[in-house]
Amino acid sequence: MKNFASIKDEIQKIAESILKEYNLQIYEINNFFDFESDVLQILVEDITEPNKALDFDSIISSNEKLSDALENFPGLSEPYMLEVASAGIEKPIRSKDELVKAVNSYIHVELNQEKNTSSEIEGILLDFDVNKDTFRITYFLKGQKKKVDFKYEQVKFARYAVKF
């Protein structure tokens, strides 16, 4: 799509109103060329629980309704494929607000500096202390339960994780 940057906000507004009906929200909107056609990809997540497993029927229904709504959208005059999909179970946590929403979730976090001899931690994000502006994560290291406090500014990378 040649004009994707100029129409992305309008597509987002249309998609947001439709996705709310299915208790979904936009995680990310992408445009890329694949299988010899333009693809408009809308990655979604649950509104209330960002890492909740999504209902396949909701994704299909929202895709169909969004496809109908975009059919008459003047900015999409060239052929394209619409793909509404889950953002994934191990999706990146991209902001402090998203990390706050991840409290009580199992996450993987990489810190700029080591804490308790490790800069990479996988565990349950227990809490966000508003007064201290710090997060607390609990994890196991060599069979012992540990807790670490960190600030968002110390985070190099974070994502949801699957506990095995």
Swiss-Prot record:
GO biological process, one term: translation
GO cellular component: cytosol
Keyword Repeat part of the UniProt annotation: no
InterPro entries: Ribosome_maturation_RimP (IPR003728), RimP_C (IPR028998), RimP_C_sf (IPR036847), RimP_N (IPR028989), RimP_N_sf (IPR035956)
SUPFAM superfamilies: YhbC-like, C-terminal domain, YhbC-like, N-terminal domain
Compartments where located: Cytoplasm
Domain of life: Bacteria
Keywords: Cytoplasm, Ribosome biogenesis
Major localisation: cytoplasm
Biological function: Required for maturation of 30S ribosomal subunits.
Similarity comment: Belongs to the RimP family.
Protein name in the entry: Ribosome maturation factor RimP
Organism: Mesoplasma florum (strain ATCC 33453 / NBRC 100688 / NCTC 11704 / L1) (Acholeplasma florum)
Name of the encoding gene: rimP
